[in-house]
Amino acid sequence: MSEHNEFDVAELRREYIRGGLRRKDLTEEPIELFERWLNQACNAKLSDPTAMSIATVDENGQPYQRIVLLKHFDSNSLIFYTNLGSRKAKHLAHNNKISLHFPWYPLERQVSFLGKAERLSPVEVVKYFHSRPRDSQIAAWASQQSSRISARGVLEGKFLELKQKFLNGEVPLPSFWGGFKVTFDSVEFWQGGANRLHDRFIYQRQGDSWHVDRLAP
């Protein structure tokens, strides 16, 4: 019988020193504060500032998380793209409720969105698809996301085969590749604070406006 090692990481901690978030710092619309924080994350040269963890659930209620990149946003929604045969896309076809989380650790900040996802039309998707690097377009064809493969060489071989196939002309949009628009109705902003007295504010949509509450850390 193999032995199982136990790892105690309770002593791994640090203090949060960057300052707090006060009500006077808030904006009327949550997307305005999100845009400000995102710009600050970009200006601070954070790695992948548009990376977000998205959570979905399967038909049995089992949650799954993965990292994707935010590509567009406006005052009501956020957009990401994916393979429509992926696990996340299948989950959203069954239950379109979704959570998106931006962890900006160096800035001691987090932002969480709750909402519902809907598929973008091919017309909406194709413009973004053709703005991607050509090799990324080909990779979208090569990978049947979440399917089982015997070795990485299978994937690389398929990529090279498709690269030759699409050597001349435009790479067409795969029918199995698309995007999702997440319309959000709840946004929480978290800012680290001294002595674990973190600042949390939650925006919740009420008709055409937003109600804001401070939450205990």
Curated annotation (Swiss-Prot):
Per UniProt, the enzyme's principal EC class comes to: oxidoreductase
Catalytic activity reported: pyridoxamine 5'-phosphate + O2 + H2O = pyridoxal 5'-phosphate + H2O2 + NH4(+); pyridoxine 5'-phosphate + O2 = pyridoxal 5'-phosphate + H2O2
Annotated metabolic or biological route of this protein: Cofactor metabolism; pyridoxal 5'-phosphate salvage; pyridoxal 5'-phosphate from pyridoxamine 5'-phosphate: step 1/1; Cofactor metabolism; pyridoxal 5'-phosphate salvage; pyridoxal 5'-phosphate from pyridoxine 5'-phosphate: step 1/1
The record's annotation in HAMAP family points to: PdxH
Q: How does it assemble?
A: Homodimer.
What's the family?
Answer: Belongs to the pyridoxamine 5'-phosphate oxidase family.
Query: What protein name is recorded for this chain?
Result: Pyridoxine/pyridoxamine 5'-phosphate oxidase
Q: Which organism is it from?
A: Photorhabdus laumondii subsp. laumondii (strain DSM 15139 / CIP 105565 / TT01)
Taxonomic lineage of this organism?
A: Bacteria, Pseudomonadati, Pseudomonadota, Gammaproteobacteria, Enterobacterales
The record's gene field reads: pdxH
